[in-house]
Design a protein with these regions (language model features):
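Glycine-enriched loop-and-adjacent helix/strand subsegments that border the catalytic/binding cleft
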Residues: 4-172
Length: 172
């Protein structure tokens, strides 16, 4: 039997904000307020720093309250990097496929923790980038767009389901 090795990202991790329709709808009334006075016209991204990475099964100290963020991470790379992703080594560089778009080398379940904050536009780093606040599962082979859209992610804490994320509700 081949044991599953713990995996952590070897490159930069970017997270999208306002990526689920319910989040976008929740924050829509505030989008017309300063400082931006309009809805975003491009993806709003944030970076998870290396100190946030925690392996699957790790004990993470979380102050109350904490926001849980079950999500699916996409490992970016070309087809030659797929074997590395399966072996637990994600490639950090973004390589383009034949159509000029990045190729998805694999997928990984993530729990993106954060502390509650009043603004998506400028949350202090200390709310998102605390030690262990990105719990990483084990990478798997890439999925098609249809397979991804059909997924639901359930997050359980102490055996109790506390969050369900339906990927069909992503903002397109």
């Amino acid at each position: 039997m081949n044991p599953v090795l713990p995996w952590l990202p070897s490159g930069t991790v970017y997270g999208p904000l306002l990526n689920l329709r319910r989040e976008y709808t929740l924050w829509a009334p505030k989008m017309s307020e300063p400082p931006y006075q309009a809805a975003p016209r491009a993806p709003v991204l944030y970076v998870k720093t290396a100190n946030t990475f925690a392996t699957q099964g790790a004990t993470v100290a979380v102050p109350a309250p904490v926001q849980l963020g079950a999500t699916l991470g996409l490992l970016i790379g070309d087809e030659s990097n797929q074997a590395a992703a399966h072996a637990g080594y994600a490639q950090a560089a973004i390589n383009s496929g034949a159509n000029g778009l990045p190729v998805i080398a694999g997928c990984v379940l993530l729990n993106d923790l954060s502390l509650p904050h009043a603004s998506y536009y400028r949350p202090p780093i200390r709310f998102r980038n605390r030690d262990g606040f990105l719990v990483c599962g084990t990478p798997v082979a890439p999925l098609t767009a249809a397979q991804l859209q059909a997924l639901s992610i359930e997050l359980h804490v102490n055996g109790e389901r506390v969050q369900t994320v339906v990927l069909a509700t992503l903002v397109s």
